[in-house]
């Protein structure tokens, strides 16, 4: 999301200094350690009973990502850069939270001998998603629009939600 967001902001004429400010959204992955204990200990009402603690956090995080991306599709960054930043923060925070929950889920459900293979599979999926969200989003934006691009990315996250 971050590389395509920079391209989108530049494409619509947002000032370079403002685009630089948006790079702070990436810090969420570095500071996820501060809310990881909450994800580790807090059971989400209703969802926990249906899916269990880890899967409920994964689903909530994916809902946050999809919502943030969908909202970003409909925000004009030249008119409301603060709203775009809020949506970006929602995506970044939700993405980092998903990372915490998926790691915890992987550790709990698999035997120790399978951990390396599962971690590698997760990283492969993450890298594939980066490619789709990067090159795929840029391709869609070039041939259709940024709005369509972000809506499709939100829809793809929705597909992932079905697998939880």
Segments (PLM) and residue ranges:
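Symmetry-related core transmembrane helices of the 12-TM Major Facilitator Superfamily/SLC fold
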Residues: 59-66, 148-164
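Helix-loop boundary and gating motifs at the non-cytosolic
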Residues: 1-29
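Cytoplasmic helix-loop-helix junction between adjacent transmembrane helices
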Residues: 90-125
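Transmembrane alpha-helix termini and helix-breaking/packing motifs in multi-pass membrane transporters
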Residues: 40-43, 47, 70-74, 131-151
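C-terminal ends and interior cores of transmembrane alpha-helices
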Residues: 44-45, 56-79
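Central cavity-lining transmembrane alpha-helices of secondary-active solute carriers
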Residues: 19-45
């Amino acid at each position: 999301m971050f590389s395509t967001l920079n391209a989108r902001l530049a494409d619509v004429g947002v000032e370079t200094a403002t685009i630089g400010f948006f790079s702070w959204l990436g810090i969420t992955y570095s500071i996820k350690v501060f809310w990881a204990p909450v994800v580790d200990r807090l059971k989400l009402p209703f969802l926990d009973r249906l899916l269990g603690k880890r899967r409920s956090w994964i689903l909530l995080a994916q809902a946050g990502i999809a919502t943030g991306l969908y909202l970003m599709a409909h925000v004009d960054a030249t008119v409301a850069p603060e709203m775009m930043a809020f949506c970006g923060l929602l995506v970044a925070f939700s993405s980092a939270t998903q990372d915490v929950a998926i790691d915890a889920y992987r550790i709990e459900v698999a035997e120790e001998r399978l951990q390396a293979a599962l971690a590698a599979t997760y990283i492969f999926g993450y890298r594939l998603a980066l490619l789709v969200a990067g090159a795929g989003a840029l391709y869609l934006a070039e041939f259709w629009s940024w709005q369509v691009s972000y809506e499709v990315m939100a829809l793809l996250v929705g597909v992932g939600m079905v697998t939880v």
